[in-house]
Amino acid sequence: ALDEKSCGGHFFMKQHSVPKFLDNFLTRTLSGTVFSWREILHLTFPNVLDCLSIMFISMLITALISSNGEASVAAVSLVTPLAWMITCIFNGISAGGTVVVAQSCGMKDPVRIRKAAGMTLWLTVAVGTVVCLPLLMFPRQVLTLLYPEAEAVVLEKARIYLSGRAWSILVFTIYTANFGILRGLGESGRCLALSVIINAAYLVFSILFLNVLRMDILGSVFALLLARFIGTAASLILLFFWKAPVKMTFGQIFTGDKGILRSTLQVSIPLGLEQVCSSLGNVVAEMYMISLGTTALATHAIANSVIGVWYSPAMAAANLSVTVVGRCFGAEKYDEAKRYGVRCDQIALILVLLTSALFIPLLPALLGQYHPTPEVLAMAKKLLYW
């Protein structure tokens, strides 16, 4: 029999009393045979906090980097979409694994859960390593090919940042796979804990290397590497050792199953291609933007980091849908899967409206954290308001 703990049961909400009219409304809109409304909300809140913390700390890191000048911000802006495009490839594999793990939970099949978790881990790491090799071996050539018009100082800083970020990606593949497995199991509490650990470490190390030691772009590289090492170690502990939701031996990680592999790739390939195409568009935008100068690149980077926080709660609803819909499919509750997909879209829309109402009045204060020149501040405001 499948232990409730194996699919995140021990993180479900306690039965706190709520007004009857609210309980009736939430039961009609969010409850089903697979999930109660309490379970849906308990999956939603950690996801929102997870995405919000990631984007907020990313915004703070960009603000710290901006204190070293526009060239540093521009260098990070050039590398970020390229690194994200590579990340999207193995992130697609991890997302496919999340769906298969969630389906296995819905089937209440512990053997399949272990097989799906193991395959998600080794496949994500293998694909991530392969696609990262060009960045590790030829960072300068890749940047020169994509951004031939970049200023020399920006290009050199971008080379340092790309090399360091490529090494961090190798470590990050393990974290991404483990995070996807935990999300598929419904372990939202552990996912939130991992996000807090890796992002808090990134922020602390960034303050140390950028503000205290004044190491400029190299400090950002060291901060990212150390944070991802710590996050990866924590993900391994939370998945396999500390009250392990999946009990596996080392050898079981590398077991193969054609059916599970096929199911994983059926989700991973279209999802990965969609994300890669989106990221490729950002790379192309940077290629055209480079001719506008370093100031334009810095403005774009600052505006992007702010808008990432703005939309992060809505992104959480998309993450929620992967677990919820996947679990319903595994339980063969296809009508509920469709209904929960619509509900996740509605939750995303509500969150976008709420964050818009909150963030628009706060934009001047948020932009002030970047120490921008008056020109950059004016351009960033215009971009964000439009």
Language model: regions and residue ranges:
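Residue-level recognition of transmembrane alpha-helices
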Residues: 44, 77-80, 124, 162-165, ...
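Small-residue-rich hydrophobic transmembrane alpha-helices
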Residues: 73-133, 172-191, 299-363
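Membrane-interface helix-loop junctions in multi-pass transport and translocation proteins
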Residues: 189, 199-233, 365, 369, ...
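Helix-terminus/linker motif at the lipid-water interface of multi-pass membrane proteins
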Residues: 55-74, 143-152, 208-215, 276-309, ...
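Interhelical loop/hinge segments that connect adjacent transmembrane helices in multipass membrane
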Residues: 8-43, 221-224, 235-278
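Signature of the first transmembrane helix
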Residues: 38-98, 102, 266-291
